[in-house]
């Protein structure tokens, strides 16, 4: 995905977590800033009418917490996420991508990362790349291993809808449990619509995003595979 105007409040939340902004930083996927889309007026009216009708209904029911802002802070008036991070005082910001030739590191995240990259970074950021990688387990494990202990992982990924956007849309439980079981402590967790409305739960709207930031507390030797908790609860009640 990319940095969008309506998502800026969530970025500011995460950037203000103590210890999050620390060199060196790796961004998985070269991320441009898209603060305006070129679409036809008819499509725009149709899209906005549907969105705002949906939002009004859900806000009345208390499911929508806030309305997104439209002002772009000075620090975010850049062309890429890398440049934005430098405005926050970071100096060693690198990008990893398989297709975009602007990236500093070219890697296929379906494959294990090089040993030389393990434990190198203090912050690893993925805003919408995980869902495009076929091998989710390997990709997550790579992201985990790129980090130093006490480093921060920032994930932004679809958790409802987004049909035909990427290979996957993830259950929040899948991502949260995978992160926690592999040595991380979640420090930030929110859900939003594609246009930045904060949600109580991702099943409220057709397309929803999970925002997660977690601190790496320990190094695991092997990936710990999560199990879906609801089935354990169901069978436990049947005993």
Listing of model-derived features with the role each one plays in the protein:
Residues 197-239:
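Core SAM-dependent methyltransferase catalytic element
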Residues 160, 166-192:
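Conserved Class I S-adenosyl-L-methionine
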Residues 33-96:
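Aromatic- and Gly/Pro-rich amphipathic surface segment
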Residues 1-23, 32-46, 50:
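Class I SAM-dependent methyltransferase Rossmann-like catalytic core
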Residues 34-38, 103-105, 113, 133, ...:
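Short catalytic/ligand-binding loop motif for oxyanion handling, primarily in non-cytosolic enzymes
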Residues 26-29, 213-215:
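Short beta-strand segments
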